[in-house]
Each structure stands twice: as C-alpha cells, then as structure tokens.
C-alpha cells in the first residue's frame, strides 16, 4: 500500500534534494518494464492526447527548467526529512512552454544522439581506466618489464 507500480516510459518526481538537483528530479523509467517506488514520489505518464515527444519531455525534465516552477510551489521551509513540500495538485498544475511537435522531434533527436555519444565516451573511458589499472599492476609489481631498445 505504500508503493506505486510504475511502468516503462512513465515518470517519477523525487521530491528529495540530491547533488545537482536542488528541487528534486523527474526521471523516466526506461531501463526496466516496471518498477516499484515509494508513495513519496509523484508518478505520472504523459497523456496520449497531448502532442509531446516523450524523449523531448525527458530532456526537458533533465535540463532543470522545471526548477523555476518548482520553486514557486515548494512551500518555504517546507522540508520534512529532506523532502520538498510539493503536493501532487500543485505539481500537476505547473506550466511548461513547449514548442510545436516538429521542433520537439528535432530537439529530441539531437539531444538523444548527444546522450548516446556521451555514454559511449564514458564506456571508452571506463575501459581505458581498466586497462591502465591492469598495466599498473603488471608494471609496478614487476610482472611485466620494460625493455630498453
């Protein structure tokens, strides 16, 4: 009873402050088919009859633009155990300005591609760091020697 079942492509607003997210964060479930979250979250899905690109909305949420609206509805000094005092009613009454669907699609395509490139770069960095650790172990313990030419 104290949990919500969230399905793929639905969103959750975490009202907790975390590093880089002073007004909490809105995240899309896209790595799993479903998940369970505490009722402290505000969960929602985009309406079918609204012209909004889900990837655009995800990037919009990630950008922090919503913080300007969240500041208006979060009660001053209304933190309880690190949670912002944001009601679902106030949350769903927030306004957002969005461009036409064609522009949303273009923006989403560019930003999703950029995110994929960043992920590939992170993977490459992790692989290089792993290789370096392996080389350090071999070189610094004498398991591998450098031959002067």
Where are these regions (language model features)?
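Sequence-specific dsDNA recognition surfaces
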Residues: 1-14, 20, 45-46
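Short amphipathic alpha-helical coupling segments at ligand-binding clamshell hinges
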Residues: 53-60, 106-110
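Short, ligand-facing micro-motifs at secondary-structure edges
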Residues: 13-14, 18-38, 55, 59, ...
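A short glycine-rich beta-alpha junction/loop motif
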Residues: 34-40, 75-102
């Amino acid at each position: 009873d104290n949990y919500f079942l969230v399905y793929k492509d639905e969103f959750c607003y975490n009202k907790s402050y975390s590093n880089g997210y002073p007004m909490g964060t809105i995240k899309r479930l896209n790595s799993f088919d479903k998940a369970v979250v505490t009722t402290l979250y505000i969960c929602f899905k985009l309406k079918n009859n609204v012209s909004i690109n889900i990837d655009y909305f995800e990037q919009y949420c990630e950008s922090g633009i919503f913080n300007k609206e969240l500041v208006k509805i979060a009660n001053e000094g209304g933190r309880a155990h690190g949670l912002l005092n944001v009601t679902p009613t106030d949350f769903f009454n927030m306004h957002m300005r969005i461009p036409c669907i064609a522009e949303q699609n273009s923006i989403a395509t560019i930003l999703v591609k950029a995110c994929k490139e960043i992920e590939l770069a992170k993977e490459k960095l992790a692989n290089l760091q792993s290789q370096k650790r392996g080389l350090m172990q071999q070189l610094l313990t004498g398991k591998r020697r450098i031959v002067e030419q």
